[in-house]
Swiss-Prot record:
Belongs to the complex I subunit 5 family. Signal peptide: none annotated. Keywords: Electron transport, Membrane, Mitochondrion, Mitochondrion inner membrane, NAD, Respiratory chain, Translocase, Transmembrane, Transmembrane helix, Transport, Ubiquinone. This is NADH-ubiquinone oxidoreductase chain 5. InterPro entries: NU5C-like, Proton_antipo_N. GO terms for biological process: ATP synthesis coupled electron transport; electron transport coupled proton transport. Core subunit of the mitochondrial membrane respiratory chain NADH dehydrogenase (Complex I) that is believed to belong to the minimal assembly required for catalysis. Complex I functions in the transfer of electrons from NADH to the respiratory chain. The immediate electron acceptor for the enzyme is believed to be ubiquinone. It is found in: Mitochondrion inner membrane. It holds the Pfam family Proton_antipo_N. The lineage of its organism: Eukaryota, Metazoa, Echinodermata, Eleutherozoa, Echinozoa. GO terms for cellular component: mitochondrial inner membrane. Its main location: mitochondrion.
Length: 190
């Protein structure tokens, strides 16, 4: 069985996008309780442990470092994808998910186009988003815990905007980028 280079690169790119979507489900906080004998507070990167005087402890863990590590891995994977793209002389590929209206003169479908512009933008966007998230975690604790979630959704909307090959996905990506930039600017002003 021979796998074409286009199929390999498209599957790597689709898996990168699926993993970006999976960050949305893992960006919540986790709180657990246990009993300990001493009281005090212990805090380290992304997690804190508060021990009360009665011996119970509350773990509070945010997934900021986990999201950053996933984005670092995806940025590295997209670099490999970019090098494969250059080395294998990749042809653009159009992936159609569904045809909504097929009885009209123009078929309305959800389709995305993987071309050299998108592959380069995917690599640049992942590296820039990873460095922004890494800097924001190292810079200090943000009182708003939704910053990683909003940045990830913003990245996903930018990717939808750049790879869309249908008017509906173009509109969805454009509106998502506009709305998320409004939310991120509003969050930074508070």
């Amino acid at each position: 069985m021979v796998i074409s280079p286009s199929t390999l690169l498209v599957s790597i790119t689709l898996s990168i996008i699926c993993l970006i979507v999976s960050i949305l489900y893992t960006s919540k906080s986790f709180v657990a309780q246990r009993n300990f004998l001493t009281s005090g507070n212990i805090a380290f990167s992304g997690a804190s442990l508060n021990i009360t005087s009665d011996g119970s402890a509350v773990y509070s863990w945010t997934n900021g470092p986990f999201s950053i590590n996933i984005l670092k891995f995806l940025a590295f994977l997209s670099l490999i994808n970019l090098f494969l793209f250059v080395g294998l002389e990749f042809q653009e590929t159009n992936v159609t998910f569904s045809i909504w209206l097929s009885n009209t003169a123009a078929n309305v479908s959800l389709s995305i186009l993987f071309d050299h512009y998108f592959i380069v933008f995917l690599t640049v966007a992942l590296v820039v988003t990873w460095s922004i998230m890494n800097f924001s975690l190292l810079y200090g604790e943000d009182p708003n815990k939704n910053v990683f979630l909003l940045l990830t959704i913003f990245l996903l909307n930018m990717l939808i905007l750049t790879c869309s090959n249908s008017l509906f996905l173009l509109f969805l990506g454009w509106e998502g980028v506009g709305f998320l930039s409004f939310l991120l600017i509003k969050m930074m002003n508070h």
